[in-house]
């Protein structure tokens, strides 16, 4: 709707200087996702070329794969667009074929839906993990959809591309791994007899996801660092690749749990400010006046995180989101009157 990045949106809520903290936080999250996907790439290459020697071993492949993925992010939005034209149709076809093979191989829908995983999760833990898997992308959504021609196109792209298509791909992955009993997707694809083509498409899926992760991380950092976006892409990409090659993907579930609780309060504060306090009226460009730091926004965000991690009833993601919205609304309507808690002022030039 606003046509700006998440970091720009945060300027109105957290302040001109405060938004830099949010930019760094989101950059760390997306760089972390980059590292995780680099690890998955290494696993896929190892499964694809088990006799390829050290060059296709999991951690070495993760390193050179991360460097290659950095190229399209370096090219910017044009690079993302070119790769997506190739990858998206291939991923859709693989998902449909994978679901059909999984269902048929398991004896039908009833049989596959009755499969019990070796380590089942509780409903609340599952929801937190799901929110964690979506939270990073949701936070970065405006970084991608800001190029949409209007608000309607942005919403349609988000609903169909992210909520519907992405959910179907995740469901397809679950059905394939459930049908084979393999938790590692590359191994599961091979176990189902989908072959090398499936692994190549899986690599494309990882690539298209990861160049977006690095692109978004660079946008977040460019909001607060005096360097060009290209330099930030290279430095962030190399550091995230090293972390990924060291095995961050081995802690994937823990990573999702952290994101599922920590990111919703950031969104909660921005949503509350935009819809409930500012009436969906944000201004940008020369002459726009921002506060430097909105202390109430940070207190609400941190309060939501604390509640999400410490309150053990209900669903942690919803608890942290709701707490941040309520806290921010109450603080701004009471203590926030008369610019209390609003530190400094800065005019956009």
Task: Give residue ranges: language-model regions.
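Transmembrane alpha-helical segments of multi-pass small-molecule transport proteins
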Residues: 23-26, 50-75, 89-98, 122-138, ...
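Juxtamembrane transmembrane-helix boundary signature
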Residues: 1-13, 23-29, 333-341, 345
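C-terminal membrane-solvent junction of multi-pass transporters and transport-like membrane proteins
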Residues: 267-349
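Membrane-interface loop-to-helix entry segments
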Residues: 60, 64-65, 69-102, 117, ...
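Hydrophobic alpha-helical segments and their helix-loop junctions in multi-pass secondary transporters
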Residues: 73, 89-116, 126, 130-134, ...
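Membrane-water interface regions at transmembrane-helix termini and the short interhelical loops
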Residues: 43-52, 65-87, 143-149, 216, ...
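Hydrophobic, membrane-embedded alpha-helices of multi-pass small-molecule transporters
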Residues: 102-105, 114-176, 190-211, 291-304
């Amino acid at each position: 709707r606003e046509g700006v990045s998440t970091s720009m949106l945060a300027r109105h809520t957290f302040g001109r200087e405060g938004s830099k903290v949010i930019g760094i936080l989101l950059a760390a999250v997306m760089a972390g996702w980059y590292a995780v996907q680099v690890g998955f790439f290494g696993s896929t290459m190892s499964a694809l070329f088990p006799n390829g020697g050290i060059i296709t071993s999991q951690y070495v492949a993760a390193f050179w794969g991360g460097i290659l993925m950095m190229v399209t992010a370096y090219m910017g939005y044009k690079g993302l667009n070119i790769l997506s034209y190739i990858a998206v149709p291939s991923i859709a076809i693989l998902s449909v074929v994978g679901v059909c093979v999984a269902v048929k191989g398991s004896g039908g829908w009833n049989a596959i839906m009755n499969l019990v995983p070796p380590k089942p999760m509780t409903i609340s833990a599952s929801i937190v993990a799901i929110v964690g898997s979506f939270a990073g992308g949701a936070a970065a959504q405006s970084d991608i959809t800001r190029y949409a021609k209007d608000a309607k196109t942005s919403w349609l792209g988000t609903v169909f591309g992210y909520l519907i298509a992405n959910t179907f791909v995740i469901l397809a992955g679950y059905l394939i791994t459930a049908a084979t009993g393999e938790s590692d997707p590359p191994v599961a694809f091979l176990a189902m007899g989908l072959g090398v083509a499936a692994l190549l498409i899986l690599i494309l899926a990882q690539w298209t996801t990861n160049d977006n992760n690095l692109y978004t991380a660079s946008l977040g950092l460019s909001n607060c660092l005096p360097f060009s976006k290209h330099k930030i892409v290279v430095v962030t990409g190399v550091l995230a690749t090293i972390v990924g090659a060291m095995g961050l993907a081995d802690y994937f579930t823990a990573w999702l749990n952290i994101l599922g609780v920590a990111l919703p309060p950031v969104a909660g504060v921005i949503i509350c400010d935009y819809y409930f306090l500012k009436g969906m009226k944000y201004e940008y460009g020369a002459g726009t006046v921002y506060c430097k730091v909105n202390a109430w926004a940070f207190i609400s965000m941190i309060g939501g995180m604390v509640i999400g991690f410490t309150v053990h009833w209900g669903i942690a993601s919803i608890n942290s989101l709701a707490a941040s919205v309520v806290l921010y609304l109450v603080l701004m309507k009471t203590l926030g009157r008369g610019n209390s808690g609003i530190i400094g002022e800065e005019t956009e030039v």
